[in-house]
């Protein structure tokens, strides 16, 4: 009886000691955007919290063509982030800081947007459900919604998600994550 108890104890100890931890799964980063939308029942604006999955937004940017406004919908197109066409920041403008060097440097954007040394930001619609925006839709083009995934030209580095503060118009703000 003692031998059986010892055998069970040794077996349990061996299983515990030899157990290999399983790798942790990386959690998807969720971005939260605040957007004022009109309530059709009250006809008043209400602030909505819109949630975006970073993996889905990055996937949207990878499915987008690497062009500046040359599609039926004009997306993706150059996100100036407050800069002028020469990469200068006009007085009184403050660019959004994404926290990545590729995303925060002043742009270099040639006339056609395809120069060998060009580097700039592109914006492309992204949605809470992660579906791909139909970039070649013409009239009527798909509603782009309030949020945009921002990424770099030419290497498609993910910068972040921004959204209009009121429906699909007005100021663009960096969403939180």
Curated annotation (Swiss-Prot):
Gene assigned in the entry: sar
Catalysed reaction, written as an equation: a 28S rRNA containing guanosine-adenosine pair + H2O = an [RNA fragment]-3'-adenosine-3'-phosphate + a 5'-a hydroxy-guanosine-3'-[RNA fragment]
Extent of Basic and acidic residues compositional bias: 99-119
Pfam families xrefs: Ribonuclease
Domain of life: Eukaryota
Active site, per annotation: 77, 123, 164
UniProtKB keywords: Disulfide bond, Hydrolase, Lyase, Nuclease, Protein synthesis inhibitor, Secreted, Signal
Enzyme Commission (EC) number: 4.6.1.23
Main subcellular location: secreted
Statement: the UniProt record of this protein carries the keyword Transmembrane helix: no
The protein, known as: Ribonuclease alpha-sarcin
Disordered, as annotated region: 86-119
Signal peptide interval: 1-27
Disulfide bond listed as a keyword: yes
Assigned protein family: Belongs to the ribonuclease U2 family.
SUPFAM superfamilies the record matches: Microbial ribonucleases
Localization per record: Secreted
One of the GO biological process terms: negative regulation of cytoplasmic translation
Cystine pairs: 33-175, 103-159
GO terms assigned for molecular function: lyase activity; RNA binding; RNA endonuclease activity; rRNA endonuclease activity
Function: Alpha-sarcin is specific for purines in both single- and double-stranded RNA. Its toxic action on eukaryotic cells is the result of cleavage of a single phosphodiester bond in the 60S subunit of ribosomes. Inhibits both the EFl (elongation factor 1)-dependent binding of aminoacyl-tRNA and the GTP-dependent binding of EF2 (elongation factor 2) to ribosomes.
Entry GO terms, CC: extracellular region
């Amino acid at each position: 009886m003692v031998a059986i108890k010892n055998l069970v104890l040794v077996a349990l100890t061996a299983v515990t000691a030899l157990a290999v931890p399983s790798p942790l799964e990386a959690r998807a980063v969720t971005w939260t955007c605040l957007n004022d939308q009109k309530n059709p029942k009250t006809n008043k604006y209400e602030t909505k919290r819109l949630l975006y999955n970073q993996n889905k937004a990055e996937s949207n940017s990878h499915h987008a063509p690497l062009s500046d406004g040359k599609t039926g919908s004009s997306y993706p197109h150059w996100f100036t982030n407050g800069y002028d066409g020469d990469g200068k920041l006009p007085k009184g403008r403050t660019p959004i800081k994404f926290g990545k060097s590729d995303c925060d440097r002043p742009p270099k954007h040639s006339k056609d947007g395809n120069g060998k040394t060009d580097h700039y930001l592109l914006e492309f619609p992204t949605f809470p459900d992660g579906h791909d925006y139909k970039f070649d839709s013409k009239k009527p083009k798909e509603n782009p919604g309030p949020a945009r995934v921002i990424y770099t030209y030419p290497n498609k580095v993910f910068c972040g998600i921004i959204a209009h503060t009121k429906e699909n118009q007005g100021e663009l703000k960096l969403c939180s994550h």
